[in-house]
Every structure is written in C-alpha cells, then in structure tokens.
Amino acid sequence: HHPGICNAPFSNLYFAASGKVGPCWIQLGDMGERWSPDRSIRDIWTGPTFTKLREALAEQRFPGPCGRCRHDIESGVAPLAAIYDREPEIIEWPTSLELELSNLCNFECVMCTGDLSSKIRRNREHLPPLDVPYDDSFVDQVAELIPTLAQVRFSGGEPLLHPIMHKIC
C-alpha cells in the first residue's frame, strides 16, 4: 500500500482551473503538466513527469515542492501527503480525483483570490476571466476512470455553478 513517503502520485490527480495537473495542489506549478484536448488524462498519468515523481518518492526523495511536506514531517506537523495515506489499495489507475475545473463563483470571500473566485478576479483584481480548458472530451476521459475511482473531490469557485461539473456527475 505504501510505495513511498507519499501516495498522491500513485493514486490521485488534481486538476486546476488553469488546466494544470498534478498529484496534489502543492505539485501543480512545478511539474508543468497541463491537460488539453491534445494531451489526455492517460498521457499525463503514464507520462515521464508522473513516472519520475513516483520513482523519487518511492526512494524517499522529495523533489521540488514536495519539500514542503518534508519540512512538515521534520517539524512534527501532519503533511499534506498524509491525506493520501487513506487512499485504497494502489492500482495502475487513479483512485481519486480532485477537480477544480473553474473559478466560477458567486461569492467574494475575504480570504479568497481570483484564482478561485470569478467575482474577485473581476471586481478586486480587475483581471479578465480565466480561460478554462476543460471540454466534453475531458468529461469523456473522466468517465473512463469511473470504474477505478473511490472518490472525487470538487473545489474551485462554487463547484455546483460549473456547467461541466453537471456533465461529469
């Protein structure tokens, strides 16, 4: 069950509103993986970036942003990696998805940013809307994963406002 210090790249895919993909939100920026209609979920999951990350973590190395979890462990604080310890048995496909597919939101919570709230992006940050890459081909690819999924977590803006979430559900 525990191939390394963190199960996230063995069990989870996190999709951000920007199209970035990683095993968790900490690894989104550094990995450089991005979903597009030309780059499938399967391509990302089986590709060299995830493969190298799995190898490093299996050898107890913390590449790039994974150092944040190492710091937490060394400080005696529960790291983000600990939430992926609860994942079911590791198989060859993801058992968990975290979907932050849009920043569409009808709130402007004081603690939030425009990355997760379209209203904040427009009214406080005065930025144009995010260009969200997810389409019907993404929905079809997620549907192919349903047999292996134990859980799907929805976040980003107000998830129930996202039209694509209704297609996925």
Describe the role of every protein-language-model region.
Residues 1-84:
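Accessory C-terminal segments flanking Radical SAM cores
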